[in-house]
Amino acid sequence: MALQFTGPFAPMCEQFVAERREAGRDYSQQEKILRMFDNFSKDYAVEPFVVSEELAQAWSQKRPNETDINRYNRVMEMQRFSKYLVEQGYPSFLTGIRLSKHYTHTPYIFTEDEIRRIFQIADSLETCASVPLRHQVMPVLLRVLYGCGLRISEALELRVANVDLSNGLLHIRHGKNGRERLVPMSESLTQRCQIYMQNVLDGKEPDAFFFCSRLNQPYSRSGVGKSFRGLLWDAGIPYLGKERGPSIHDLRHTFVCHRLNQWASNEVDLTAMLPILSKYLGHTSISATSWYLRLTAEAYPGIVHKMDCFTKDVFPVSWEENDIE
């Protein structure tokens, strides 16, 4: 469902989002930021469709407990919108603030035992009146995230028609930056999804969300995060806070590291496999995937000597959320 814009920039926001989507971009997360900006603008004296310097500077201020990457995304979305307004003939302010999008947090790589414990606890979830589908959604969602290395946004945007259970394929229609790809599932995961389809989605239309709420809306990212933190607690895995995790997105990182560790242990040619893995993950470049070589070597020191020839040139000081997410 499209978001409603009610602030002083509402018509231009709707036009801006529509043009981005016509160009093939999903724009869901950016639309949410733009709606926040439009609402934020209600407290300022705004000339028709003009982002003033005062408004731009106020929006760009770092908020309490806000991460650098979230602030970066907020400010850059305002910048893109302001530039668009200028192109439409409205003299909007373009801030010269330069922000770093580098994120130095090291992802948490779950051990295989921790993954088993998380799955076992998810499988034992009881029904809950406030979230009646949680006990059915979470066990399958977590297995899809770990088994296929999907981004959480990609999983939650899956429609029934995007899940090909006959061939064991997931059709990611709106990956990062609007990219599409097909993601194969294992036989066991396909069977799990078939059971879920029969129990939860029987009779649903093809455009229904695969991971849906009781209101037939996509299961919310915040709801998934809250449930996941509860599972971590029950599994005896310390949750160190928003900045340090573990987070639901670490299941994607763990999928990659476990796969690379398996290949390295079996002496598979990583040079040949990295391009395939890169396509599977939806990365735009092999360099984004190569970063995982370092992370895998750190998580599994015993295979470092097998990866030396691959990791010697891919040890950046920090990594970009924009590339690795």
Where are these regions (language model features)?
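Conserved catalytic core of the tyrosine transesterase superfamily
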Residues: 1-325
